[in-house]
A protein has these predicted regions:
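Specificity-determining recognition surfaces
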Residues: 141, 158-190, 387-408
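Short amphipathic coiled-coil heptad-repeat segments
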Residues: 1-25, 29-32, 209-255
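Short, solvent-exposed beta-strand edge segments and adjacent coil->beta transition regions
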Residues: 38, 138-140, 185-187, 261, ...
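Non-catalytic DNA-recognition/assembly elements of restriction-modification systems
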Residues: 9, 37-63, 187, 191, ...
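Sequence-specific dsDNA recognition surfaces
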Residues: 38, 53-70, 84-113, 136, ...
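Short coil/turn segments at secondary-structure boundaries
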Residues: 22-27, 65-72, 170-172, 244-250, ...
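Amphipathic alpha-helical segments
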Residues: 47, 155, 184-220, 270, ...
Length: 408
């Protein structure tokens, strides 16, 4: 469920005058400065398109350098407002991680609590309201002197809207490092309704956003609960507690030695077997015949799939980013040829990811190993997948990671 998209749709409606009814007795907004030659969006008759430079005073922050020489933890230090202090999706910046000494004030810009800010570098084009006094660096723009024509909250939501986001992205286009030049921001037009209508729009947005926030929280909690239940069900399944045992079913034959210490109790007819007793393991050919990536192609008509960890998605082999090797390249490979029903298991990087091949053809990259059921037919494919997904096996794998940057 895309909650961010819901918020964006509401903002789209808001800046086009479609979120709340227009007030019939409200006079039209006075045209401030020149109207745009081409209007970006259709808006109600009582609204006006106003260039930000005519609506508000915009200033850029400043940075004392080197900043390390100005940082302090003294009580008389001034809050140093960084983009990292802003939480994406939050309207407010309520605290700052660092402070600077008062001497740095000459080389920065001091902003009062309640100021409206906009990021103009790094993650540019995101507005925030500052809840503390502080100094802003040159990655921030500050807005002021707009109260005669716009409420702070309405202007915040306009700057947050998909319309303004698109305008900012367009203004930043072409640069190697995507930054918002202050002069370009000043040229952006924004839709301004009558003040009374602005209050209504803000109130309705806050009402809807609060409902979305509650729904999103409930959805996340439900996802967490579903994950917990899934793990519990899988664990009960591999312990023989999920379904009743069949009285007429013979016991599983013990293949190999019984473990000295069993991980947990299982039904009497079950047996503890190693994977090696029920599965064959086959690595890919990692010798001189291993194909270089530069020799592979994205053209599916040229040969056979060369399957790597990135192609294992949701227990299936995804065609996204799938590369192909020629039939001659596959013919030279001494091992790692995929057959229908094979379990392709990741042993490097994304350790423990797996998927099942639904047809013959292709070969595996060095990050994978093939798990292939032995002729004893002791384990079903679906049951194997549940074992591999179970908390027991996940813990087993985690205990045996080698601790390197790339687990294997």
């Amino acid at each position: 469920m895309n909650f961010d998209r819901m918020r964006a749709l509401l903002l789209e409606q808001a800046v086009q005058g479609k979120l709340v009814p227009q007030l019939e007795d409200e006079p039209a907004v006075e045209q401030i400065g020149e109207a745009p030659n081409v209007v970006p969006l259709l808006i109600p008759k009582t609204w006006k398109w106003v260039r930000l430079n005519n609506l508000t005073t915009i200033v850029r922050g400043g940075s004392p350098r080197p900043i390390q020489a100005f940082l302090t933890d003294r009580e008389d230090g001034l809050n140093w407002v960084k983009i990292g202090d802003a939480e994406r999706g939050s309207m407010h910046i309520s605290q700052c991680a660092e402070k600077i000494i008062p001497a740095g004030l000459k080389k920065t810009r001091f902003i009062r609590k309640g100021s409206l800010l906009l990021t103009n570098s790094m993650s540019f084009g995101y507005p925030y309201i500052l809840d503390v006094d502080g100094c802003i660096h040159d990655g921030w723009l500050a807005f002021s002197d707009f109260e005669e024509f716009s409420t702070k909250e309405y202007l915040y939501y306009v700057l947050l809207s998909p319309y303004c986001r698109g305008a900012f992205v367009e203004k930043a286009a072409g640069a190697v490092v995507k930054n918002l030049n202050i002069d370009k921001v000043k040229q952006v037009y924004v839709p301004i309704p009558p003040l009374a209508e602005q209050h209504q729009i803000v109130g309705k947005l806050e009402e809807y956003f609060a409902e979305i926030d509650r729904a999103e929280k409930a959805f996340r909690e439900l996802q967490t609960l579903a994950g917990v239940l899934k793990k519990k069900i899988l664990q009960e399944a591999v312990m023989g507690k999920l379904v009743p045992q069949l009285d007429g079913e013979p016991a599983v034959e013990q293949l190999g030695e019984t473990p000295e210490i069993i991980p947990f109790e299982i039904p009497q007819k079950w047996k503890w077997l190693t994977f090696n007793e029920v599965l064959s393991f086959e690595n890919g050919d990692r010798g001189t015949n291993y194909p270089a990536k530069s020799t592979l192609t994205k053209d599916s008509s040229s040969g056979q799939p060369f399957i790597s960890a990135v192609n294992l998605q949701n227990l299936h082999i995804s065609n996204d980013n799938l590369l192909y090797l020629s039939k001659e390249q596959q013919r030279k490979l001494r091992s790692g040829h995929v057959k229908a029903g094979d379990c392709l298991f990741c042993i490097r990087g994304s350790l423990g990811k797996f998927a099942f091949a639904d047809k013959d053809g292709g070969a595996i990259a060095s990050s994978l190993v093939i798990l292939r059921p032995k002729p004893c037919n002791c384990i079903m494919q679906k049951y194997l997948s549940y074992v591999l997904l179970s908390p027991y096996f996940t813990a087993y794998m985690n205990d045996r990671r080698n601790g390197t940057a790339q687990p294997n």
